[in-house]
Amino acid sequence: MIDPNLLRNNLAEVAATLKLKRNFILDTKELAELEEQRKALQVETETLQAKRNARSKAVGAAKARGENIAPLLAEMDDMGHELATVKAELDEILAELNTIALTIPNLPADEVPLGKDDSENKEISRWGTPRQFDFEIKDHVTLGENLAGGIDFAAGAKLSGARFAVMKGQVAKMHRALAQFMLDLHTEQHGYTETYVPYLVNHTTLYGTGQLPKFGEDLFHTTPLEGEVPYALIPTAEVPVTNLVRDEILNTEDLPIRMTAHTPCFRSEAGSYGRDTRGLIRMHQFDKVEMVQIVDPDKSMEALEELTAHAEKVLQLLGLPYRKMLLCTGDMGFGSCKTYDLEVWVPAQDTYREISSCSNMWDFQARRMQARCRSKTDKKTRLVHTLNGSGLAVGRTLVAVLENYQNEDGSVTVPEVLRPYMGGLEVIGK
């Protein structure tokens, strides 16, 4: 949620920025009318409250003098009813303003390039050189289906439907090894605290990080029993991990807080019909190691560079070529003010594919969550800044390893950094 003071004091400017950079049309007339009503009702509420307080003091004084206070009490009672009515009207207007505010995307940072879609993202750097194969390469589906145990897409479809898979044997072991390797790297070298979180969360949590109300159709929702709250399966560990600081006032001196979690993620892929229907690239259920940072609001841009470097380190240690992209305004996530995507080289597709998205959410999520910090030398609180990034998507990393480390006979060499997690295994055979 963007700062409501920006909407109140710079409505036209904010609306113009949202239209230009986010292709978002803000109804300024409706907002201005609601804001006028809010101000009028706020003044009326405060005036009535002051009058009622004055009458309350008058009652006390009259009672002390032994006077009849019945007329004053009746007057106070009338004021109370009037005050309750005005407060109810004010609450209704505030709710309408809040509903609108929840639909407004974050404002991009000044350095984010203007663009309509991913074709206008800016390449920042590349690492590694794509391998030149001297044999006809196979994609991860063909490789996975023919490795020992391997990947069974038919079994996934039988159990659940499209966009599910079953892994067995050494491929399943490599999938687990990748997640363990990522967690160990982030906790032992990058300073993150490993966190285990629920996979089902309530709607308050989803509002906190911005999944609701805009992205409800992308979630898998439970059907609650009578008297129970509805839940949704997490689309990313960002949701529960970031919400750990909801309604908290943190010591600024204790920041940054770095947390990481390995979880399954569940997405309906509502807007992805027909895209990546083959293989592990786009699944309804996939594993991811997520990194979250809660930082001093003056230090979030440097934290974004650090967070992104932590994700890059995973790819570098695995020896996987990748490129770093700065997303343009038209390709950024709803709550982000600046995002880097890391795209790994996928040989069978002869292109780079997203494997990590690292974002600075500024105070957008913190305002929704009321997550604040306060210095020991200053009584004033400030909204923290929140950041998140994939470190990495495990399934897509498996895709990249299988394809980049494949051999002519269909076997796959195990990257050296994974071998300690796989009992010293050097090659996954057929």
UniProtKB/Swiss-Prot annotation:
Q: Name one GO biological process term.
A: seryl-tRNA aminoacylation
User: Carries keyword ATP-binding?
Assistant: yes
Pfam families from the entry?
Answer: Seryl_tRNA_N (PF02403), tRNA-synt_2b (PF00587)
Q: Which InterPro entries match?
A: aa-tRNA-synt_IIb, aa-tRNA-synth_II, aa-tRNA-synth_II/BPL/LPL, Ser-tRNA-ligase_type_1, Ser-tRNA-synth_1_N, SerRS_1_N_sf, SerRS_core, tRNA-bd_arm
Principal subcellular localization: cytoplasm
Q: Which UniProt keywords apply?
A: Aminoacyl-tRNA synthetase, ATP-binding, Cytoplasm, Ligase, Nucleotide-binding, Protein biosynthesis
Which reaction equation describes what this protein catalyses? tRNA(Ser) + L-serine + ATP = L-seryl-tRNA(Ser) + AMP + diphosphate + H(+); tRNA(Sec) + L-serine + ATP = L-seryl-tRNA(Sec) + AMP + diphosphate + H(+)
Tagged with keyword Protein biosynthesis: yes
Example GO molecular function term?
Answer: ATP binding
User: Which amino acid positions bind L-serine, per UniProt?
Assistant: 236-238, 290, 390
Q: What is its EC number?
A: 6.1.1.11
What pathway does the annotation place this protein in? Answer: Aminoacyl-tRNA biosynthesis; selenocysteinyl-tRNA(Sec) biosynthesis; L-seryl-tRNA(Sec) from L-serine and tRNA(Sec): step 1/1
Q: Give the NCBIfam families listed for this entry.
A: serS
Functional description taken from the UniProt entry: Catalyzes the attachment of serine to tRNA(Ser). Is also able to aminoacylate tRNA(Sec) with serine, to form the misacylated tRNA L-seryl-tRNA(Sec), which will be further converted into selenocysteinyl-tRNA(Sec).
Q: How does it assemble?
A: Homodimer. The tRNA molecule binds across the dimer.
Family, similarity comment: Belongs to the class-II aminoacyl-tRNA synthetase family. Type-1 seryl-tRNA synthetase subfamily.
**Swiss-Prot/TrEMBL domain comment:** Consists of two distinct domains, a catalytic core and a N-terminal extension that is involved in tRNA binding.
Q: Under which name does UniProt file this protein?
A: Serine--tRNA ligase
Gene name tied to this protein: serS
